[in-house]
Every structure is written in structure tokens, then in C-alpha cells.
Amino acid sequence: VDELFNESVIQREYRLIGDELAPMLIQGGYPAAVAAQNPRVLRRWYRDYFQTVTSREVRYILQLGDSERLNDILRLMFGETSHLLNIQKLASALGFSRTSIETYIAASERLFLVDKIPAYHPRSYQRHIRSPRHHACDTGLALALESYDDTTLRQRREVMGQMLETMVVTELLKHASCAANETTCEHYRDRDGYEVDVVLRQGSRVVGIEVKLSQSVSSTDARGLKRLRTVAGDDFQAGYILYDGRYRIQLDDSIHALPLSAILT
């Protein structure tokens, strides 16, 4: 993370992830899951883990009394991972009150099943959207609950893109916790349609990160980062588009394309 702020990420040849991406997303990051070799065993482990955590923790620690309600909410949230969370949409889909949805979302955050990413608020710009994004805590868990395998995931590019962004956010949260300076993970979106997947913030200094499910990148992909650079002003340190390539490429002033493997492996 500190290298991202200093624009000092090592310039070298990185490895392509390519066809390894789908299996990587399906496997997720839990140590017990990483050790599983059989896809069916992997899915079973994730489902058992999910059931154990939600039923035990909801009943005995959170004392909410209804683990099935939490299960239903989490399944829908996992399907919307990386998106702005529409609480009213969840409430309508499940027939729950808005208050109940908010209570169970807070519970899912306490159980570390969901990561809440707040919105970045530029000091001099008022057209930003304040809604947070929510990410599944682990791509393997989210995909196991929907029975995705390697073949079906490759056929759903939109889902792969969502899960890739979620995996990047998970990794950045880990790196941020070890950074030399206190670092928060936020996101940016405004009413003009510009958005940045991740905004790393150290004090007032910010770095923008976009995640792209592609092996190529161009300066036109940097429109969100350029808007962030404008609204953040002198606080903007650098912007990166993560892509499945081999080299770091400068696209614009303080904006670079950076291989995914620099973050994920």
C-alpha cells in the first residue's frame, strides 16, 4: 500500500493470471478452503462453515433469534457484491422491514461476513454519492453458496468482474492493516456517473484503484481516476488500473496500469 502512495511499485515483468483467475476466485482465501483439492469438498466446506457461523453466532452471541433471515439477506448481498447496497430493494425482495435489514447487515459486518466500504467525500466537491459499497468477505464463500464451478463462472463475465473486484478489495484491506501509515479503504461515485472502485486514504492523501477484467488497458479506462484526480486536487497521489497484464504502464500524469498479480499474488 505504501508503494502505491509513493508510485514506487517495482517495474518488472509480472506474471499473467489468465485461466487461473476463475479457480482462484472459487477457492477463495480461507486456509482450510485453500487446502481443499476437490471442488465438491470445497463447496461443502464453505456451506458448512456458513451454516455454522450464522446459526451459532446469531443465536448465542448476537441474540437475534433468526439465522435463516440472516442467511437470506447474505445470499442476496453476496450476489450484489461490489455494488452500492440498496436497502429498500433488499427489504422489498425479502418482505422484511428496512429496520430489520439494517439490523442484520450490521450483524453480518460484526461476523466479518461482509466488508463495508464507505464513500470518499472530497472536501470541495458536493456531487458525490454517500452510499457505501458492501463486499462479500470471501469470493469462495459467495460463489459456493450459489454453486458456481469453473465452467459456469467463466460463462458469467459480469459475475467474474464483481468477484475480482471483491477479491482485490479483500487483499487491499489486508495490506492496509499492515501499512506504515493508517490507511482506510473507501470508494468514489458521483452524480455524473464517474466512479472509482477503491480509494485508499492516508489522512487527506488518496490513491484511486480501478479493477478491470481484461488483459489490455487504455487511457480511456482512466476516466474515473481522472475525475478523482480533479476533485481531490493536491490530495491525489496516484491512480492505478489493475489489469491482467505483465507490465506497469503510465497512462497519464500519476495514473498507471498495474498488473493484477502485483496485488493478488
Residue ranges and their predicted role:
Residues 244-265:
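Domain-level recognition of nuclease-like catalytic cores that cleave nucleotide substrates
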Residues 201, 208-216:
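Active-site ExK catalytic segment of metal-dependent nucleases
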